[in-house]
């Protein structure tokens, strides 16, 4: 089984982007907003700060108290919208429980041309048409891997498992536009992925995906994330696939989607900076 290194792909993307930014003389600025947050949230923000620096850009972190109100948060977003030194704005999710139901409304306050995460309803809506906008970094990360093995999706059979607004829905929209034979499932069942060239599993449970029902040579993208006794794991039982000698290509958890997602965020950030010129 071929294990795909998300870290290696991300490094390639960052290096190319750094060189392009240097040639064009741009140093994009990413403003990140974190409301409250746990240790893991600070870790993810730190990874994005490092990626911005590694690609020739810079970042700001606005760390607000856990009890920040919706009005206070949206006022901070309005300030960043007007700040011409800021090219992209990222709201670290999830928000605290008191703000969680207002997530879409708060995301909508970010100017679409600075919404480098592609999370706002405006950018999500543009996906269904041909208007330019920012695509979710999770969907772009998946597409980056898929295109390395399938430059053309026409006639390929793909199965996506999940219903998320940041991965499954935008990725499905892109794949349909490229004439892919697509099935989107709410949950994973081995028989329903039979014959798939591409399998993306976001929704499920730890280790649910094994060789049963899968075609040899399938590209599997694990987009699950669970904490277990042995650390972080995903939907794919990698050990079982390796024991069985199953022929597949796997983007695993950990070390798969995460690094690529952040690298694609940096590409969106650079695009936002270019559009201001």
UniProtKB/Swiss-Prot annotation:
It catalyses: (6R)-5,10-methylene-5,6,7,8-tetrahydrofolate + NADP(+) = (6R)-5,10-methenyltetrahydrofolate + NADPH; (6R)-5,10-methenyltetrahydrofolate + H2O = (6R)-10-formyltetrahydrofolate + H(+). It comes from Syntrophomonas wolfei subsp. wolfei (strain DSM 2245B / Goettingen). Homodimer. GO terms for molecular function: methenyltetrahydrofolate cyclohydrolase activity; methylenetetrahydrofolate dehydrogenase (NADP+) activity. One of its GO terms (cellular component) is cytosol. Its EC number is 1.5.1.5, 3.5.4.9. Belongs to the tetrahydrofolate dehydrogenase/cyclohydrolase family. Pfam families: THF_DHG_CYH, THF_DHG_CYH_C. This is Bifunctional protein FolD 1. Pathway: One-carbon metabolism; tetrahydrofolate interconversion. Catalyzes the oxidation of 5,10-methylenetetrahydrofolate to 5,10-methenyltetrahydrofolate and then the hydrolysis of 5,10-methenyltetrahydrofolate to 10-formyltetrahydrofolate. NADP(+) binds at residues 162-164, 187. InterPro entries: Aminoacid_DH-like_N_sf, NAD(P)-bd_dom_sf, THF_DH/CycHdrlase, THF_DH/CycHdrlase_cat_dom, THF_DH/CycHdrlase_CS, THF_DH/CycHdrlase_NAD-bd_dom. GO terms for biological process: L-histidine biosynthetic process; methionine biosynthetic process; purine nucleotide biosynthetic process; tetrahydrofolate interconversion. The gene is folD1. Keywords: Amino-acid biosynthesis, Histidine biosynthesis, Hydrolase, Methionine biosynthesis, Multifunctional enzyme, NADP, One-carbon metabolism, Oxidoreductase, Purine biosynthesis. Disulfide bonds: none annotated.
